[in-house]
């Protein structure tokens, strides 16, 4: 064994330590305060226990301020919760307890399932365990010992987990005082480092290993954060998210509904369909100059999906259909017995359109766009309003270009995506490049070239944004058929939504034999770029509803203005106001009911009407209007003509407004 090991620190300095030194030893050599605040170490990027011996490499000391500490806090909180449950209900079996987004859960085998009333008791016991500050210590057990000990404790699920661990792999046991669990780790130094910024959120049922043929377990979800302020912010965000839930607002605003006969497909009501069409119309205008809109069939022979690879890679997520006649009349030799599939993606259809007719390099790039209805199977339990459906519309486009055109096309797509997001009020955008996964098609040379181009594009995006756009790399997260950019936007309450993608595809052009004639009169395979901006139009609409809490921008709102009268004497003038607004292009309804004006205003506010114009005897005499805005107590009095002009301008989509302003500037 070497007499010394050499560690490189984040500042570039290199120090030697005796062989056998642990992460804690390294932290203590720097300062006692660092050793006290340290929760783990990272060697060459891999997070490890503080008690682990270190080897040559790059070392980082992880404290609670480090983003990586959050996963450790949540992981340890799950273990503390499991110990608390077994102290409160002896005989309960623990199964698995992973970290998930924003928290953790643990599944338990218990005779009687947990109820929400149990959660405060468990939280109290967890705080007791945390206060004990018991150290986390790691042991390596043999398979035989682990099975024997867990079997003796009646932990049958743990025995099954031990059996599932591959032979030759270490079996790690982590102790926290007298309690222990089978776990890969890593963990922090002690239960005390979990802190008290946690909350148990809910109970649920879950099948063992997610299989409905297995036993039903009792699951407890929790969340944990580095400090109380972060926990409070998260809980506030959840409360806001509940108020903004698009399913609730969709009912209140009479936009859409779902029902059992069509699980995961939307029944659009008139107002909801208006929003959807406004979104499609806007996107269609943005594509009018550079793209050719096409439409590929929704139902295609599975032979095509076999060629594309979807039938092999994606079959479980597809809907297959066969004619009822062929199924009920097998004796009919003329019947079409083929199996067809509803398209889950638009790309194979677009390749067929590209292939139809010889293409020259002079015609490239060819950009094909479609608002294509696609269908993908999702388990019933995964369906979630507009956010997770089985039938949805993709704002899909596919660009066929030369290798040399790839960078320019990616930048052009980026400009369009960012401009669209900005028009909808999204300012905080993150663009990340996902690179080659282990399992992939295409040669290393192809990947090298594509990743080099996209890395340069990412640098250009960052430079052009002057810091407004954050960028990053997701190693190994690319699709099997090519690297991609992922666009994530942040909404009004801080949630992140991954929407846009720019995806290079080495697979489909080769599978379908797509080519163009290059400058040497040779057949050459084009570069194919998949592009989506909203992604699922339904999901994007759901994001908009939640981002604006139903108070959509006037140009997207399905009902833009309600004209309400105070007295029947103003009804004739109210009709005149409504007609003037309609002539200016606004969606308007009138409310001349014999109800008090405050009642009318409250009622229309619930349905999120953005503008209510109130007309009484005074307004009729003076030919003015009283404007009330959703969410504001202010009342603005304006002349009718000025009000119509102002609201018409506000209701003009931003892209149309820009064109008008540019035309005006040219004429000046």
UniProtKB/Swiss-Prot annotation:
Residues 245-553 are annotated as: Catalytic. Transmembrane segments: none annotated. Its cofactor is Zn(2+). GO terms for cellular component: cytosol. Gene3D superfamilies: 3.10.20.30, 3.30.54.20, Anticodon-binding domain (3.40.50.800), Bira Bifunctional Protein, Domain 2 (3.30.930.10), Threonyl-trna Synthetase, Chain A, domain 2 (3.30.980.10). It is found in: Cytoplasm. InterPro entries: aa-tRNA-synt_IIb, aa-tRNA-synth_II, aa-tRNA-synth_II/BPL/LPL, Anticodon-bd, Anticodon-bd_dom_sf, Beta-grasp_dom_sf, TGS, TGS-like. Residues 1-64 form the TGS domain. It comes from the Bacteria. Pfam families: HGTP_anticodon, TGS, tRNA-synt_2b, tRNA_SAD. It comes from Rhizobium leguminosarum bv. trifolii (strain WSM2304). Belongs to the class-II aminoacyl-tRNA synthetase family. This is Threonine--tRNA ligase. One of its GO terms (biological process) is threonyl-tRNA aminoacylation. One of its GO terms (molecular function) is ATP binding. It catalyses: tRNA(Thr) + L-threonine + ATP = L-threonyl-tRNA(Thr) + AMP + diphosphate + H(+).
């Amino acid at each position: 064994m070497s007499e010394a090991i050499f560690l490189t620190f984040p500042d570039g300095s290199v120090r030697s330590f005796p062989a056998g030194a642990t992460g804690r030893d390294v932290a203590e050599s720097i300062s006692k305060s660092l050793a006290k605040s340290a929760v783990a170490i990272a060697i060459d990027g891999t997070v490890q226990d503080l008690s682990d011996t270190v080897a040559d490499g790059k070392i980082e000391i992880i404290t609670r301020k480090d983003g990586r500490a959050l996963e450790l806090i949540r992981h340890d909180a799950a273990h503390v919760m499991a110990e608390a449950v077994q102290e409160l209900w002896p005989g309960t079996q623990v199964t698995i307890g992973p970290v998930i987004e924003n928290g953790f859960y643990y599944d338990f085998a218990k005779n009687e399932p947990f109820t929400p009333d149990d959660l405060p008791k468990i939280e109290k016991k967890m705080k007791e365990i945390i206060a004990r500050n018991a150290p986390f210590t790691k042991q390596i057990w043999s398979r035989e010992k682990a099975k024997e000990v867990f079997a003796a404790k009646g932990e049958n699920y743990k025995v099954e987990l031990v059996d599932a661990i591959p032979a030759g792999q270490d079996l790690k046991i982590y102790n926290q005082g007298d309690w222990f669990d089978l776990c890969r780790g890593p963990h922090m130094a002690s239960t005390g480092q979990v802190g008290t910024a946690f909350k148990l959120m809910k109970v649920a049922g879950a099948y063992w290993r997610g299989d409905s043929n297995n036993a039903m377990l009792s699951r407890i979800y929790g969340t944990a954060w580095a400090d109380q302020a972060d926990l409070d912010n998260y809980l506030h965000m959840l409360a806001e998210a509940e108020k903004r839930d698009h399913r609730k607002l969709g009912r209140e605003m009479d936009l859409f509904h779902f029902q059992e006969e069509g699980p995961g497909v939307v029944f659009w009501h008139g107002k909801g369909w208006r929003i959807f069409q406004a979104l499609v119309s806007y996107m269609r205008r943005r594509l009018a100059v550079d793209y050719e809109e096409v439409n590929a069939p929704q139902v295609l022979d599975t032979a095509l999906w076999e060629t594309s690879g979807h039938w092999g890679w994606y079959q479980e997520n597809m809907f297959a259909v066969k004619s009822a006649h062929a199924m009920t009349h097998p004796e009919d030799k003329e019947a079409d017995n083929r199996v067809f599939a509803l398209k889950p993606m638009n790309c194979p259809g677009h390749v067929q359109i590209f292939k139809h007719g010889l293409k020259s390099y002079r015609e490239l790039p060819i950009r094909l766009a479609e608002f294509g209805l696609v269908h993908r199977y999702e388990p019933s339990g995964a369906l979630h309003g507009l956010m997770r459906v089985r039938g949805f519309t993709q704002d899909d486009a596919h660009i066929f270009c030369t290798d040399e055109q790839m960078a320019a096309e990616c930048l052009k797509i980026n400009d369009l995506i960012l401009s669209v997001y900005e028009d909808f009020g999204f300012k905080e955008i993150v663009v990340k490049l996902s690179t080659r996964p282990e399992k992939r098609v295409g040669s290393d040379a192809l990947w090298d070239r594509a990743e080099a181009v996209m890395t340069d594009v990412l640098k250009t995006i960052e430079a052009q944004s002057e810091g407004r756009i954050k960028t990053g790399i997701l190693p190994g997260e690319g699709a099997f058929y090519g690297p991609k950019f992922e666009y994530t936007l942040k909404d009004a309450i801080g949630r992140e939504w991954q929407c846009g993608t720019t995806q290079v595809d080495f697979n489909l052009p080769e599978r379908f034999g797509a080519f163009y004639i290059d400058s040497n009169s040779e057949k050459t395979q084009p570069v194919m770029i998949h592009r989506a901006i909203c992604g699922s139009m339904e999901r994007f609409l759901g994001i908009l509803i939640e981002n604006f809490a139903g108070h959509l921008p006037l140009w997207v709102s399905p009902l833009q203005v309600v004209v309400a009268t105070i007295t029947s004497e103003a009804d004739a003038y109210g009709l005149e106001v409504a007609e003037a607004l309609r002539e200016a292009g606004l969606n308007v309804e009138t409310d001349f009911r014999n109800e008090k004006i405050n009642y009318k205003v409250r009622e229309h506010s619930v349905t999120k009407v953005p503008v209510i114009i109130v007309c009484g005897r005074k307004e009729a005499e003076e030919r003015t209007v009283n404007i009330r805005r959703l969410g504001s107590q202010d009342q603005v009095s304006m002349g009718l003509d000025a009000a119509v002009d102002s609201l018409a301008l506000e209701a003009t989509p931003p892209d149309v407004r820009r064109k008008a302003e540019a035309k005006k500037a040219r004429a000046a």
